[in-house]
Design a protein with these regions (language model features):
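N-terminal amphipathic/basic-hydrophobic helices that include classical n-h-c signal peptides
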Residues: 1-29
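A short aromatic-anchored loop/beta-hairpin motif
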Residues: 13-16, 31-165, 169-230
């Protein structure tokens, strides 16, 4: 169903609300128009390790709203990813004993699963952090915990090089594919390492990620964070 270029997305929603009073199929119309507005009609690539999942603007789950997720593992049995733009109020000092500057190293919330586990995403590679797994060009996940502690305790730079993440996002077999088919996520095969490792606020990183997806998605950044407030 086409959208007239002369209408803004807000004009369109107003028109749809008007129609809802007289059209019993409003739910189906809303779904179709929503998909069209958000440029999701193109077939998404199959997810793979190192891909980025970007939540569409209308996802309102408290955990995943405007989330940017790096897939760190994916196979036929399921998927694992970490949200990279969900800063918490906690620091590394809350989970590891160390020098006072540990209080300046933030913790991120990677998802609702395994909140008693801490993970680390970094750019350091196996020469510095043995046994880490490369998940994308220039990005590594996990590795030798003692090596990580030594690196940080020695005062080596962390900003832009390491993110400490509590919890993760997990999908069982077929679950992520189902969510993608519902257009909850769009997939980016390659994304800037500096963006993933940046310390922007959640909404700012999401908007920057939208920009990296190209021109056709830029209308997403005009969508209010809380549409009900408008």
């Amino acid at each position: 169903m086409g959208v007239r270029p002369s209408l803004s997305i807000f004009d369109l929603w107003a028109e749809l609300l008007r129609r809802s009073a007289v059209n019993s199929n409003f739910g189906l119309i809303m779904e179709e128009i929503s998909i069209d507005i958000f440029n999701l009609l193109d077939k998404q690539p199959d997810p793979a390790r190192g891909n980025v999942l970007l939540a569409k603007p209308t996802v309102d789950d408290a955990c995943f709203k405007r989330s940017v997720i790096l897939l760190v593992d994916h196979d036929s049995e399921g998927s694992m990813g970490v949200i990279v733009n969900r800063l918490t109020d906690y620091t590394l000092a809350d989970v590891i004993e160390g020098p006072d500057y540990f209080q300046e190293i933030p913790l991120y919330m990677g998802g609702p699963v395994g909140l008693n586990q801490m993970f680390f995403l970094h750019t350091l590679g196996p020469d510095v952090i043995p046994n880490c797994m490369q998940v994308a060009r220039g990005l590594y996940f996990g590795g030798d915990y003692e090596a990580v502690k030594r690196y940080v305790a020695c005062g080596e730079p962390v900003e832009g090089k390491m993110k400490f993440i509590v919890g993760y996002s997990g999908w069982e077999k077929g679950q992520l594919a189902d969510e993608i088919s519902r257009f909850d996520w769009v997939i980016q095969k390659h994304i800037d390492e500096a963006l993933i490792m940046g310390d922007q606020e959640a909404d700012d990183m999401w908007k920057a990620a939208v920009e990296s997806f190209g021109e056709k998605y830029r209308t997403w950044n005009n969508w209010p964070t809380n549409p009900s407030d408008n």
